[in-house]
Amino acid sequence: LVGATFKGNDPAGTLLAWRGFAMHDRQTTFNESIAFAPIASFNTTALQYQANQVLPFEEVDGRFGYYAGIHWDYLKKSQFRFYYYDNNGDPAALNRSTGQYAWDTRFSSVAWLYKFTANTRLIAQMMSGTTAMGAKRGVNNSFYSHFVLVSHKMAKHRISMRYDYFEVTDHDDWQFDPNASEGEGITATWRYQLTPQWQLGIEGSALHSQADNRMAMNNPKNLSQQQISLNVQWRF
């Protein structure tokens, strides 16, 4: 069993509402700000105090949140993880000087790793939750995502395939501020262990997504994106 209490992440739901999920491996650093695209609804009276950026680690309402979880391992072949997260946010709280609301964000997360052999494994994870802001929960969304990854190692080579699905569902009645989005993607990766310290790799991904707020910014609702990246990694 694991658990903790925390503060300093009240605006986290902002990203899900106005950007949606994103497929990348970049971690936001402490005190970093993340700018939004020119969201049309930020020009309305209802959202006039919302900044065009989010500060994910800001404390707004002074409340403590918590998470609790359970880990279960079986015969060194199977690992199961379950977590429940609640930031205990007050959705009516607002810091006008920074333009950040406290979002009420809650979710459950389930993860499973299974080793078919010493060289082949499967990893799957699912997350489902809700997030809302405003005194009357003017922005009120639910979100869901899952991925499945299969990885196989052959001598110094490792090949992996991953499928992702994600969605944000808009439950509020603010027609001027659409938040719904959905997407799926597939990623293929090859890694080569050149030495104990050096690793080479290539990764290709394809993503198709749709977001209702894109049209207000004169962008197509549906987008398809592809990316190929090369990787050189040194560990010490």
Features from the language model and the residues they span:
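Aromatic- and glycine-enriched pocket-lining scaffold segments that form the walls
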Residues: 1-77, 83
